Amino acid sequence: MAIASGSWVATVNHHANPHSFTSPTKPIFFLSQKPHNFHVCSSRCSMVLEEDEKKSPSPKEDKWPFFEPGPNDLNRVLSRFLRDPETRKLSSEFYEKAKENSELRTTKHLISYLVSSKSWDLLVSVCEDLREHKALPDGQTCSNLIRSCIRDRKFRITHCLLSVFRSDKSLAVSASDAAMKGFNKLQMYSSTIQVFDRLKQSVGVEPSPGCYCRIMEAHEKIGENHKVVELFQEFKSQRLSFLAKESGSIYTIVCSSLAKSGRAFEALEVLEEMKDKGIPESSELYSMLIRAFAEAREVVITEKLFKEAGGKKLLKDPEMCLKVVLMYVREGNMETTLEVVAAMRKAELKVTDCILCAIVNGFSKQRGFAEAVKVYEWAMKEECEAGQVTYAIAINAYCRLEKYNKAEMLFDEMVKKGFDKCVVAYSNIMDMYGKTRRLSDAVRLMAKMKQRGCKPNIWIYNSLIDMHGRAMDLRRAEKIWKEMKRAKVLPDKVSYTSMISAYNRSKELERCVELYQEFRMNRGKIDRAMAGIMVGVFSKTSRIDELMRLLQDMKVEGTRLDARLYSSALNALRDAGLNSQIRWLQESFDAAQTSTSKYSNTKNTGTLS
């Protein structure tokens, strides 16, 4: 028998077959017949241990087990004992004791060496030889070997080794379990299914709970939920131990598959079955069930499961809490959303920005901006951390309530926290500057926005055009208009209306007509705001034909006239003496639609007569 390590060189001298092996790194151990001489050479000592053949056992008793070398301490102790003549006999006995380790240790080290040296084909050959001699290693070694092959992407070797290990029932199960787990990690679910099918084809081999867990996980990942349920029924029929560590995962997977198949109530029955059998529930199981019932808007069941999970300290999924919050928002139970936040805080679960913005936005739409602001301030007192979207909603609420100082303070706080590229927040602040006639602040904000790498959108351009148009600063408005087009931001209806309105105030009516024609060429749809401006423009410029075309387009597009617009158009036609056009206008836009004044109706009737 030869032993070699980093500091050992061992030589075995046999009467017929001398063996020697040296390795600077890894030890390899071979089984040989009884040695006559055993020479130990070490960097620390060089001694010879002579065995007395008279005391050697008979051939019948010559059973040398496999040897597992001890740690470096064993080398040091043996060397020290061999130096002293008085302890040489003791060292021999100590060495014999060391050889009495498990008989499979040598196989483990040989396999470990072949794996580390990447000798895959030789590894398969060794395992086949071990099968021939019925000396396969234990289940743990086989499982580690399979995991190593999959980790190094040696899938052909993996399947070859699995075929070798299937000769032993216990090894077949443990090795297949390790293989399926490895394939699932690599998302090779078809390979997992293949391994499970071959395992079931083996005679007298029953898959373990772990094998069922891996195969159910694979089918769930590829969307075969019906197959998961079938395997679960098969698992229960096998009467395997429900107290296995994989049982909780198995029940979680089947509940998830049932919920995804729209069978949430059956999943709830499976949960009750778990409780009856004493299988501990997991946070993933509760999360999946709560999400399923929240999406189905089953409020009572969702509340029950949510409270149950909170009582068992299994609230660990913020996404599930978001589903519950959205359910309450859709149902209009806004106050209950605050209870969800309180439960999350109690469970030390972070309240995400998605949850906060859903709550604040829900209050804003259903209860008004004042309530939304109160909820936001309450959340901040609860030490919830707002994100970019929540900040934007709160800033908009403050602006709508005309609390401009708070809106600006909140915007500054938002920028300091690093949320300096939120276009919606910039738009709200820009609109606020326009309403408060702070044109210079708006221009500075635009410059900062560009400096921070945030591109202005159509809302910001519209706000700037509108505020400069109202201030009669047409040069600045035209500059912004051209900049918007250079940035390839297409003008919308509001953009054109603001520009036309600005030029109308400055009495540049021809420019108004040019912009209107450009708007119509771009297939813009007329609204009452633009129609009101253009009726006045066409009337002032005596463009009666274009006025009639405008009114006809409005009728075709279904745009309704208000009293002011109706009166303006009617007066323009009357001044031009176009009675037939007046009659058409009255027939096309009746008094019920326009809600015109009694004075206008009376005056128009007198004109027709």
Swiss-Prot record:
It is found in: Plastid, Chloroplast. PPR repeats lie at residues 103-137, 138-168, 172-207, 208-242, 247-281, 282-316, 317-351, 352-386, 387-421, 422-456, 457-491, 492-526, 527-561. Residues 1-44 form a transit peptide. PANTHER family: PENTATRICOPEPTIDE REPEAT-CONTAINING PROTEIN GUN1, CHLOROPLASTIC, PPR_LONG DOMAIN-CONTAINING PROTEIN. Belongs to the PPR family. P subfamily. One of its GO terms (biological process) is chloroplast organization. GO terms for cellular component: chloroplast. It comes from Arabidopsis thaliana (Mouse-ear cress). InterPro entries: Pentatricopeptide_rpt, TPR-like_helical_dom_sf. The keyword Isomerase does not apply. GO terms for molecular function: mRNA binding. Signal peptide: none annotated. It comes from the Eukaryota. This is Pentatricopeptide repeat-containing protein At5g13770, chloroplastic. The keyword Chloroplast applies. Keywords: Chloroplast, Plastid, Repeat, Transit peptide.
